[in-house]
Amino acid sequence: MFKKFILLSFLLLLSTVLKAQETIPFRLTKHNNIIVKTLVNQKDSLHLMFQIAMEECSVSPERTRKTDHIVFKNEISDGNTVKIGTKEYKNIRFFDNEFTGHESDGKIGTGIFKDQYFKIDYDNSQFVVYNQKPDLKDYEEIDLLFENGQFFVGADNIIKDKQQEAYFLLQSGYSGGLLYSDQFAEDHHLNENLKIIGEKKVTNSSGKVLYTKQGILPFFKIGNFVLKDVTAAFFTGEIKNQKTNYIAADVMRRFNWIFDADRRKVYIRKACILMLLTIK
């Protein structure tokens, strides 16, 4: 009987080890950005911001750490290695002169997780990378649209007691809650229908004016989870550049996320920091 118990314990431990292939620690900044410590080409120690909306890596013109061993040609560098902890990733592409978030020298994308399940675990400040389907108990499945290396999910916006569905790009580099496209903002009259708590005016070199508005969305529903009083930004004015809706870092951090290897599904569970209403 004792031998059977030992064997069962060993098999359970082995199963856990096989499923959780590796963990990557990160630090969450006060701006809600994820920072990963890396060693590039075995020489350059860089703090890179995780950007879920890209696959490759980049360095910023405002970086504070040296990148002497990343060789660029026409602002592109191929064949680099990136070491995180004890794991080294090879053949990584870097772009030069791309701006990044606070406290970082550049960005790191999802390419290091290619063809694998991966989890953004905000509760424990780590990524978990799996070599097979992990335990998804207590997670809710959501359809995922994956295009050009970017992740999109559908969600509902409650505006003036009306439910408006839209697709959102997951954008961990933008520190706010939501950012709406110009089209969505115009179609649903956000300037009139949201409570506005802030405004910033910008004038470009041609004299055209752009206003950045900060509003409050009463309810935002993703899957069966409802967030209340979510900060939501949008633009008004003569400049029309915002083509996509964003679910940004302040909303992303309220959940733990597991992405499947095929990038067709994402599984979410509320994080410990989240105060929300769950629809039964």
Give the positions of each predicted feature:
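Bacterial Sec-dependent N-terminal signal peptides
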Residues: M1-P25
